[in-house]
Amino acid sequence: METMLSATAITKLRDGKLMLATTYNGLFIERDGEWKQILNGFQKRIRDLHSEDNVVYGVGDEGIFIRSMNGGENWTVQRFPTKATSWNVCSNVQGTVIAHGDKTLYHSNDFGSTWETIHPFLEYGGGAPSIRSLFLYKHYLFIGTKIHAKYGGVWLFNLETRKLKRIKIVMNQMISALTVHNSYIVAASGSCKGISGNISFCKIDESIESEKTYWHTCQSEQKASSYLALSVDQHVLYTTSTQNKAGISTVCRVLLEEGLVTVCDSVKGHGWRIVNQKEGYVVAGSGESKVMQWKKKII
């Protein structure tokens, strides 16, 4: 185990290298067991990093978007036309990239060189929900909202037909993360009030094809206000939480087959992001970042 700087995002590259977005000191990459700073000088925090082969995308505060086509050697830094924080960026190997503003999507088909703005909730006008999380699956985009008393929950947006449908109704919690695991779509949710954060899941084919979607909620070994991040690798699924009153958050294994969320570690501050390599993982936390059982020796 090793702890490092306060951080907001983490990703792993194709060759197993780790890239960390720190809270105050820019981006670092782990090379040959050492962490080296590769990008700094911008004031905005990066809230998510996503890599596809050797291409890395990052998004964050006030619409910042960063991109490297060569594993972090060179970077393009630009801004989306929004003052909102972009919490998620997703992509595929064909060059599709999607990020978000408050109620808008930014969609690219050329690795982020050019962009189209999409308003998925246009018909809801000023009452539209704000976006908190995204997950791309084939040509379907799963959208998780911030807390919204009327339109909160998980939505499914078809990028080909541009049709939108709501697949999970959640009024009093944000959907902070979405992922796909063993043919299920998995949602992490919660709010800053109470201890009702949960992990829920449904069959992905059912969510796309059926009129009614049945969600199952996992039992949590230890209560949390909210779960914040999800990471899956080789059928191993992890989640992280917000910090408790003592300033400590949890790292948990999610066992969908048993319907359980089991605690396996703790981190100082909020567990903003996690990336795993089977059972090994790295957490980007607001108080510290933590490395557990990663195959490369990290100094």
What kind of region is each of these model predictions?
Residues 269-299:
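Blade-level signature of beta-propeller repeat domains, shared across WD40, Kelch, NHL, RCC1
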Residues 106, 149-155, 194-202, 246-252, ...:
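Structural motif
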Residues 1-4, 39-42, 79-82, 119-126, ...:
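Surface loop/turn motifs at the tips and blade-to-blade linkers of beta-strand repeat domains
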Residues 24, 62, 103, 147-148, ...:
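Residue-level signature of beta-propeller blades and closely related beta-rich strand-turn architectures
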